[in-house]
């Protein structure tokens, strides 16, 4: 696709990421600008295009159109932002369960196409106008066994696991924790440690299989399964979520 959007820098700023800057095009779409410099940024952007081409159309993947100026993507509400703005208690359990199932469905599809997302989390899932969730941000993902250029958040990565299906599943467990509680795992450490120390401490805890308590959570068994290596595929995760 080579059409160009009606767009100017005067449009609303949405976000700035590692690779690109995102602006609103209209009420339904955003544009993720093509990076103009930086080898890493260019490589990650090219991988994102390849990922969207590989994934094609799927109801759990935000639709993408490639233009000269950037990627035109569906505009939704960031799941993390929604949890923080309305509060997790304001979202009914039935809706959280639906989103968990849909996210598992989306990640299963991503894996079936030979793609490892490599940054699974509530920050990379949007809620659309119909209250369904979709995955976004494949900049730097891994395709067909290639090493990803990106990695997970500090609260979603276990050292030594390697980047692949199992690491995506581990991060999915942290995503479920945040979906239910409104906070990332070990969020209470964020205010007392700088980022370098925070990463080191949490990675050490995860390496020793010391995870936040989940016994009182509805997703407890699935979260624990993701963190403890119970699952070999996200389809198994989806199956157990469906039993809740």
What are these regions, as identified by a protein language model?
Residues 5-57:
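ATP-binding glycine-rich loop module of kinase domains
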Residues 103-110, 176:
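Conserved hydrophobic alpha-helix
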Residues 29, 60, 71, 134-137:
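Protein kinase-like catalytic core scaffold
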Residues 52, 104-107, 223:
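Hydrophobic core positions within the conserved protein kinase catalytic domain
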Residues 132-134, 139-236, 240:
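C-lobe/activation-segment region of protein kinase-like
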Residues 107, 111-128:
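Catalytic-loop of the protein kinase fold
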Residues 56-99:
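Conserved structural core of kinase catalytic domains
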Residues 24, 33, 73-75, 127:
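Conserved hydrophobic "DFG−1" position in protein kinase catalytic cores
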């Amino acid at each position: 696709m080579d059409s160009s959007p009606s767009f100017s820098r005067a449009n609303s700023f949405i976000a700035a990421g590692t690779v690109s800057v995102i602006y609103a095009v209209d009420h339904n779409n955003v544009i993720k600008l093509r990076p103009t410099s930086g080898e890493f940024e260019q490589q990650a952007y090219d991988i994102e295009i390849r990922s969207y081409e590989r994934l094609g159309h799927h109801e759990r993947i935000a639709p993408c159109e490639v233009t000269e100026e950037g990627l035109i993507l569906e505009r939704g509400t960031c799941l993390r932002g929604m949890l923080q703005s309305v509060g997790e208690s304001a979202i009914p359990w039935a809706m959280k369960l639906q989103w968990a199932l849909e996210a598992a469905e989306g990640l299963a599809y991503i894996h079936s196409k030979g793609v490892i997302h490599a940054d699974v989390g509530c920050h990379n899932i949007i809620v659309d106008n119909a209250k369904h969730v979709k995955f976004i941000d494949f900049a730097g993902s891994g395709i067909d066994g290639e090493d990803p250029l990106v990695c997970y958040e500090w609260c979603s990565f276990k050292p030594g696991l390697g980047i692949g299906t199992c690491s995506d599943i581990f991060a999915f467990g942290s995503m479920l924790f945040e979906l239910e509680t409104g906070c990332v795992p070990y969020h209470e450490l964020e205010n007392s440690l700088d980022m370098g120390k925070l990463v080191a401490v949490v990675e050490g805890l995860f390496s020793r299989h010391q995870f936040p308590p989940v016994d009182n959570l509805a997703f407890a068994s699935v979260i624990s399964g993701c963190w403890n290596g119970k699952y070999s595929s996200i389809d198994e995760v989806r199956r157990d979520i469906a039993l809740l």
